[in-house]
Amino acid sequence: MFGAGAMTNSIDEIRDTDFLFVIGSNTTEAHPIIAMEMKRAVRQGARMVVADPRAIWLTEIADMHLQLTPGTDVWLLNAMAHTIVEEGLCDEQFIAAHTTGFDALKKTLASYPPERAEITTGVPAESIRRAARAYATTRKAGIYYTLGITEHTHGTDNVYALANLVLMTGHLGVRSAGLNPLRGQNNVQGANDAGATPVFYPGYQRVSDPDVRGKFENAWGVELSRDDGMNLNVMMKEMARGTIKGLFVMGEDLVLSEPNVSRVEEGLNGCDFIVLQDIFLNETARFADVVLPAACFAEKGGVFTNSDRRVQLVRKAVDPPGDARADWEILCDLARAAGYPMPAYDGPAEIYDEMAALAPKFSGISHRRIEETGDLQWPCPSTDHPGTPTLHEDGPVIGTAHFEPVHYRESDELPDSEYPLILSTGRTLYHYNSATQTRRERGPVMKQRGSFIEVHRRDAGKIGAHDGDEVRVLSRRGAVKATVVISPRMRRGCVWMPMHFAEERVNLLTNDAGDSVTGTPEFKVCAVRIERT
């Protein structure tokens, strides 16, 4: 819709914003440094609205908490947009100059009044209207979201609905405003920038574009596929069907991180050959035929790109232990062993130069320049360009932004009499993703030793469970044990569990139904029940 797969604005702009709409983001636990900027903005007078099924820490300082039912984001966002149109709060000048498709959007929004949204979301209609008015009438108003928006079968629709809000209010190309996805891991942005996706080459250039493909074929001296690749969720399903016979796994613990993990394990058992490249022997290592020891961040050089497109150097501090090597060295040797004449790169700087020469967004970025400036934000199209802290200041980078009307679609799996609760999963402050690293550290383990399930008091009371009791959590795919935490943060009918613990893998429960565009699984909604042990 805008032409850039990243934050439109910079992290350091958050402190100067006047309004923050935080949706699907437990920012203080998943992005604590960014949360510090949000807290600073609120201390300086900014208003904050949080939309989340749980009462996260930010709700304590927010002006409003829209505690919606998991999976009903499109209803909430369309109802906010309905209010903005109905009350004449749109930026008509921006819409006329920079967008298309607004009339079609208005027709869709007519079916989403806040009063009807209240029935589905559980959020009072007047709260929806107040949030919409506050967002639309504040010039420096930013939207911040993470996996609570994208980890749904309709995650792409959620993002479209957010983008529609930004466009109709003219909050694009404005400092301390915009649409800002906060990336789930360090350098996820950089990995995507470099083409670690099934549909893009480096710099978000389409695999399906013959001119793009020809450029990379000439540069690399190979014939490239005309077809998009498989996303990870599709790969796991094809592996379970026996279509995929070999797997190369880098920095990923599949049997802890992927949904419906019993099916993943079936697929791994059926593979003919599996290679694991990682810094530790994680849970997936049990299935590997070959393990290649990799260097961690402090044992190699290169660049990390953070959520706001900021490219920064990572400098090697110590040598890797034993046979461990930097990822790029391992990959180059593998390519040569497979018969491809991979260049004898001097190091990561030369590899980045190759990417920058082929990707216009990064043409002006090099290790040498970052050494001088400290960092650079793309797009940076030339060596004398200063980088771009705020995108779209001269209008959408694709020329004209297009509104994308979306309709509400139910989550793939809803609660019923057999499985009456909605389970969402996520991260905690003390552990990081699959906890391959943090559970090897004494401090985080002391703070949080094992799995737990947050439950509303009335839901726990239905089965006679008390705080600290051990229960079984069951879904249509599996069962795990967890310690009950009676939590005022939870909506009735909803429970929440962390994803970190190998002993009780919550992804034995989760649903691998994925978004039709991205394939991202629906980690945020699956039907479960709890039983006393």
Where are these regions (language model features)?
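Flexible, small-/acidic-enriched active-site or ligand-binding loops
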Residues: 438-449, 500-504, 508-509, 515
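Glycine-centered loop/turn motifs
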Residues: 399, 468, 491-493
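Long, low-complexity segments enriched in small/aliphatic residues
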Residues: 192, 197, 215, 348-443
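Short, acidic Gly/Pro/Ser/Thr-rich loop/turn segments
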Residues: 28, 150-151, 430-432, 504
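Cofactor-pocket helix-loop regions in the catalytic cores of large enzyme subunits
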Residues: 1-187, 206-384, 423, 445-485
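Long, low-complexity intrinsically disordered regions
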Residues: 515-533
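Residue-level detector of beta-strand face positions
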Residues: 389-390, 422, 470-472, 529
